[in-house]
């Protein structure tokens, strides 16, 4: 969407958040809704969670505070991919000086992202970030009227994909624990707040895209549009300048129509031992999300062998929570180094 030409009613535009593990189809969901005429979104960044501790309680926004907000925004990892125009974005922010909410100021930032897709009569802003899967409770407090689209993928296929792209240490037990952790949290929240959550499986979306996209549109009360499936025709335009050449491999799926080519990869890509580790760690939660286990019998010995990696996975969340209470500038610097830590652990494991 182009820079806001005039002050608009931001309270009339709601937020929804796309939740899911990395390599679970979250980017596909974001792309479908970026292509929808009544919805806008932007590349993942996560600035809302990062900036809320410092700005969440601000109710009176002066020019100085708004400029400071923008400058702090630009410290966030990946915000450079948005290619925001500083002067135009600040000009837009200044339209909302005075009494206003943190929520609305965040919306102004999204409205300044220039998508290659047209938009009009915008009803929703969508924000997608894999880290949000474990921040849903906090997001509900920040945006009380927000809703959530939660997408899951067969955890064994998810492990294959993450191992391929080296997002995290390529250990089946660790990746299974991470899948289990976020899935349990979101399952419980969905049970407690059923109207706020819509769950979809990547496998169902890939197999019957029209059916399940229409269901999501009905949930959001926006018209279903077949043209969203033409997103891949603008792939080059969308990725040019917004994705580092080395990262293009992560977005190959955006170059093609939705397909089922990535379903069931685990059957040939994972070793039998890795499958056993994954299914032992995740246990019944696979069935709770509609995925059938190959090995249903609990293996205590295997679980004990996986325990160190589960504890390591738990420690990552503890460290992240510590980061979140640190001063903003320190927090951002540490979060910028997060991928380096994951890469370091991955290299050590390979050795």
Where does each model-flagged region fall?
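PAPS-dependent sulfotransferases, especially Golgi type II membrane carbohydrate sulfotransferases
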Residues: 1-17, 190, 218, 222-351
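A conserved segment at the C-terminal end of the G1
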Residues: 27-38
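Short, conserved clusters of charged catalytic residues that mark active-site
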Residues: 13-14, 24, 108, 131-134, ...
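Amphipathic alpha-helical recognition patches that constitute DNA-binding helices
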Residues: 17, 28, 147
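PAPS-dependent sulfation machinery
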Residues: 41-127, 132
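PAPS-dependent sulfotransferase catalytic domain
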Residues: 113-256
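Catalytic donor-sugar/metal-binding loop of nucleotide-sugar-dependent glycosyltransferases
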Residues: 37-41, 147
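P-loop (Walker A) phosphate-binding loop of NTP-binding proteins
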Residues: 21
